[in-house]
């Protein structure tokens, strides 16, 4: 008799995705981040659900309701900090996952890659609207500044901003709709993640060499299930270390002050995971130019398959491209640091140089370097 997991309509899907899936025998720990992102999403949906049971999306009571969750609700404080720091872990895993894709040439799976980029935008949108909900100073002013950027769009900009706000400023209507968006988007992310996996399983996973691994496959279970469990345990360890020992390490102290439209904080800045894009935005003195650069900094990922000029898929055997990749990583860390600094000398010029270097590496230096490497190998 055939095993039920191979015949039952529902279990068959799970079996083909997580049990009998043929996987390359040599994928490293960089391939763990997909499963970690799945765990992060489940964790965020669960903690978010319990927070939503006690949260009120009204300007008068939002800040108080978050305080109430932390002080009066049983284990409310741990749920709240797991949700806030879970977002940080989510983005750490996301950046690692995207970095892995860039390094090993996984972007040649076009559908999987493009859905991944859409997922990245969706997660960023979710995190942004979520940051507004506690209705602290940085929530309010972050929402005001970032939504205001849409006014740079010619002709329809101002109308678009007022339409999103639901009035002439960030107010009750804005908070209510942002809560609605924040509730629905994670489920859209979950659906997109399933499509992402669907397309990945059409081609099978890439591997560190970038060479097709059809000749050497192993079953996903038990080899990679046990490997994923190790990754999940480490993820939970780091998350709980953050939650229990330094819950406010990655937050902004200004967000412990209730939102006040009459008092602007001295330094408006987003959460750490948006700082690199914020630095690129600020490095251009023109409003529309800054917005275009901001969007391009993420949208540029869609161009990666077009910019791939190497005859090899992975960077594993391409030392010059490896150097450029790690310079790009250092550049992104520099941009993250600059995004959190005040707009003054020398930070302005450092930010501008780092922004130029970011686009220069991706659009110009990487394709040229790949071509040089091809020639050196007489290809």
UniProtKB/Swiss-Prot annotation:
Where in the cell? Mitochondrion inner membrane
Which residue ranges run through the membrane? 33-53, 77-98, 113-133, 178-198, 226-246, 288-308, 320-340, 347-367
Recorded topology in the membrane:
Multi-pass membrane protein
User: What Gene3D superfamilies does the record tag this protein with?
Assistant: Cytochrome Bc1 Complex, Chain C
Query: Where does this chain mainly localize?
Result: mitochondrion
GO CC annotation = mitochondrial inner membrane; respiratory chain complex III
Task: Report the coiled-coil segments.
Answer: none
Per the entry, the cofactor note is: Binds 2 heme b groups non-covalently.
Keyword Transport (UniProt): yes
Concerning InterPro entries, the annotation shows: Cyt_b/b6_C, Cyt_b/b6_C_sf, Cyt_b/b6_N, Cytb/b6-like_sf, Cytochrome_b, Cytochrome_b_C_euk/bac, Cytochrome_b_N_euk/bac, Di-haem_cyt_TM
Identify the keywords attached in UniProt to this record, alphabetized: Electron transport, Extinct organism protein, Heme, Iron, Membrane, Metal-binding, Mitochondrion, Mitochondrion inner membrane, Respiratory chain, Transmembrane, Transmembrane helix, Transport, Ubiquinone
**What are the binding positions for heme b b566 in this chain?**
97, 196
**One GO term (biological process):** mitochondrial electron transport, ubiquinol to cytochrome c
GO molecular function list: metal ion binding; ubiquinol-cytochrome-c reductase activity
Q: Which SUPFAM superfamilies match?
A: a domain/subunit of cytochrome bc1 complex (Ubiquinol-cytochrome c reductase), Transmembrane di-heme cytochromes
What cofactor is needed? heme b
Task: Give the domain of life.
Answer: Eukaryota
Where on this chain does heme b b562 bind?
83, 182
Which residues does a ubiquinone bind? 201
Q: What does this protein do?
A: Component of the ubiquinol-cytochrome c reductase complex (complex III or cytochrome b-c1 complex) that is part of the mitochondrial respiratory chain. The b-c1 complex mediates electron transfer from ubiquinol to cytochrome c. Contributes to the generation of a proton gradient across the mitochondrial membrane that is then used for ATP synthesis.
What family does this chain come from, according to its entry?
A: Belongs to the cytochrome b family.
User: How does it associate, per the subunit comment?
Assistant: The cytochrome bc1 complex contains 11 subunits: 3 respiratory subunits (MT-CYB, CYC1 and UQCRFS1), 2 core proteins (UQCRC1 and UQCRC2) and 6 low-molecular weight proteins (UQCRH/QCR6, UQCRB/QCR7, UQCRQ/QCR8, UQCR10/QCR9, UQCR11/QCR10 and a cleavage product of UQCRFS1). This cytochrome bc1 complex then forms a dimer.
Q: What else is known?
A: Heme 1 (or BL or b562) is low-potential and absorbs at about 562 nm, and heme 2 (or BH or b566) is high-potential and absorbs at about 566 nm.
Q: What is this protein called?
A: Cytochrome b
């Amino acid at each position: 008799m055939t095993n039920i997991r191979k015949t039952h309509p529902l279990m068959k899907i799970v079996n083909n995705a997580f049990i009998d899936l043929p996987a390359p025998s040599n994928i490293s720990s960089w391939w763990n981040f997909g499963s970690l992102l799945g765990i992060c999403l489940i964790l965020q949906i669960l903690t978010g659900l319990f927070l939503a049971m006690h949260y009120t999306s009204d300007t008068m009571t939002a800040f108080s309701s978050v305080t109430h969750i932390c002080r009066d609700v049983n284990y409310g404080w741990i749920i709240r900090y797991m949700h806030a720091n879970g977002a940080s872990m989510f983005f750490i895993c996301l950046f690692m996952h995207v970095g892995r894709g860039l390094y090993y040439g996984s972007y040649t799976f076009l559908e999987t890659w493009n859905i991944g980029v859409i997922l990245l935008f969706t997660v960023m949108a979710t995190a942004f609207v979520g940051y507004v909900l506690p209705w602290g100073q940085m929530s309010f002013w972050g929402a005001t500044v970032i939504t205001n950027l849409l006014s740079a769009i010619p002709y329809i900009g101002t109308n678009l901003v007022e339409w999103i706000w639901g009035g002439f400023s960030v107010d009750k209507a804005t908070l209510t709709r942002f809560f609605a968006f924040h509730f629905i988007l994670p489920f859209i992310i979950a659906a997109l993640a399933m499509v992402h996996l669907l397309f990945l399983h059409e081609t099978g996973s890439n591997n560190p060499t970038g060479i097709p691994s059809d000749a050497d496959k192993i079953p996903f279970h038990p080899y990679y299930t046990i490997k994923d469990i190790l990754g999940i345990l480490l993820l939970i360890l780091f998350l709980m270390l953050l939650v229990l020992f330094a819950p406010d390490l990655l937050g902004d102290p200004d967000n412990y002050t209730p939102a006040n439209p009459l008092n602007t904080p001295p330094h408006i800045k987003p959460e750490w995971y948006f700082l690199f894009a914020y630095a690129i935005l600020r490095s251009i003195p023109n409003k529309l130019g800054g917005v275009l650069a901001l969007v391009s900094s993420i949208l540029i990922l869609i161009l990666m398959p077009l910019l791939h000029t190497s005859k090899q898929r992975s960077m594993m055997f391409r030392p010059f491209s490896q150097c450029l990749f790690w310079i790009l990583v250092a550049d992104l860390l520099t941009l993250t640091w600059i995004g959190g600094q005040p707009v003054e000398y020398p930070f302005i010029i450092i930010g501008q140089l780092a922004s130029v270097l970011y686009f220069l590496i991706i659009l110009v230096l990487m394709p040229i370097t790949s071509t040089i490497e091809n020639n050196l190998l007489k290809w």
